[in-house]
Amino acid sequence: DEPMIWRYFVAPLPTKLAASQLDEREFVARFVIRINHTLDGAYIFSSGKNMGVFKANGFPEDVGEYYMLENYEAYSWTCHGRYPTNTPGWHPFALLDTTVVHNGEISSYDANRRFIEMFGYSCDLLTDTEVITYIIDYLGRKLGLTYPEISNVIAAPFWSTIEKQEPRERERLTYLRNAFASLMVTGPFSILVGYTGGLMALNDRLKLRSMVVGEKDETVYIASEECAIRVIAPELDKIWAPRGGEAVIVNLNDGGNK
């Protein structure tokens, strides 16, 4: 059966927003988390202004037909087409204009969850991927870290690697690892993060999950396997496998403003 989905285009009531003394994004984020935590039988899975999330249980071609994806245009797309084996939740997971798809299993989930829930988040959607979304939202939107800095928190370099850096870089990496130790993600994983104006791909430090990046003209393709890229773009200008813990960050020339 088709999923039961209601779509609304809304803005916070000005009086409620003013009374909350929050900015609009924080107001909406808190509302989404509250609904997902308190309302049984329903949840919000798409809450961005410039980000649409499409979820369903079925074959990819049927999902595309149901949502009429041929009518949409976007500068970036992320997709997760494999049903999870360890949890009943499935990807992508999103909050506001950030979305995450994930291949792997997070052994640090409980430690990450306990820490992030101290800051108003609530992990209720039954998958370890959800906590990565909240970690990125917390570090990026609330604390103002850049995506290279976020990658250094999530896939923090080994201490032996940090010690080999130049003094300034060593100091920076040491600070990030000490300050956000509870947000380091351990276990085998590869993630793809979509955000306004770009994408970030990241492997665990030991590269226990595969990830391949290809380029053709002005387009970048990222997948778990090269064959998935070749189906879409048989001829590539460049293809490579990023090292473990090495973030691949792709930004639009105009910053996603067009």
Positions of the model-derived regions?
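Conserved short alpha-helical segments that host acidic/polar catalytic motifs at enzyme active sites
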Residues: 1-258
